[in-house]
A protein has these predicted regions:
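Internal helix-turn-beta structural module
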Residues: 165-168, 173-217
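Conserved, well-structured core segments that form the ligand-binding/active-site neighborhood
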Residues: 1-85
Length: 232
């Protein structure tokens, strides 16, 4: 999309590496991410037994791991704990609002890292219920992520919107470090990973606090975008 040539693709990738490292430091050792939406809904994401990853635009010869990046770049992600350890349930629970293009809002009720119910009375709610009913694996909370590309704007193009602030995703997660892969789904046709953005200028935005095992709480940001809270 050529519109990104004048926005997120112009970002300083050296700064993105630095700022991504700051976010990774915050997430390292965090036990819970408490996300409060501007609708008043709250969801707590269980971050135990997980490591965050970064898509920071770095693609030099000494890059560790696979030699590719996404464009635009600029996000840090983590897969919430999915309850795969015997006897250790996931603590991810709460309510996540989902907005539609026409202003409708449905609410995902989450328990043990799974969407157990979709609340609402409009067409958006019906559509989301039908989407989840196609395969139980779609109910998995598969990602939370923090976009921090300073040049990204909310344009309706998701690959840019997600780099402008917070988003979360449901369904498949193994490609991000989780445990739910294509084999977890009923059929190849029902495999899904869907991301939903809550960045600055989206109809719903968020505040995020991180809790650590020591009891320490870090307010990651209260503004619509983490780009404003990460030290330069």
């Amino acid at each position: 999309n050529r519109s990104m040539e004048s926005t997120c693709l112009l970002a300083d990738h050296r700064r993105m590496v630095e700022r991504g490292n700051v976010l990774l430091d915050y997430l390292r050792g965090a036990e819970t991410a408490v996300v409060e939406f501007t609708t008043g809904d709250i969801c707590e994401f269980d971050l135990r037994f997980r490591q965050a990853g970064a898509d920071n635009g770095y693609l030099h010869a000494d890059k560790q791991g696979e030699a590719f990046i996404n464009l635009p770049s600029g996000e840090v992600w983590i897969v919430p704990y999915e309850g795969e350890i015997p006897g250790e349930k996931s603590r991810t629970e709460g309510v996540i609002p989902v907005y539609g293009d026409d202003g409708q809002i449905a609410r995902f009720v989450v328990n043990e890292n799974r969407v157990v119910k979709v609340e609402g009375e409009d067409q958006l709610t019906i559509d989301l219920r039908e989407e989840l009913a196609l395969d139980p694996a779609r109910r998995n909370v598969g990602e939370i992520a923090f976009g921090y590309n300073e040049a990204a704007v909310v344009s309706g193009l998701f690959i840019e919107d997600e780099k402008a602030g917070f988003h979360w995703g449901y369904g498949r997660s193994e490609f991000l470090g989780g445990t739910v892969g294509p084999e977890s789904f009923r059929h190849p046709d029902t495999v899904l990973h869907r991301d939903l953005p809550y960045a600055k200028d989206c109809p719903i935005t968020v505040s995020v606090a991180l809790r650590y095992p020591s009891g320490k709480v870090c307010l990651l940001y209260t503004s619509p975008s983490p780009r404003d809270a990460i030290p330069s």
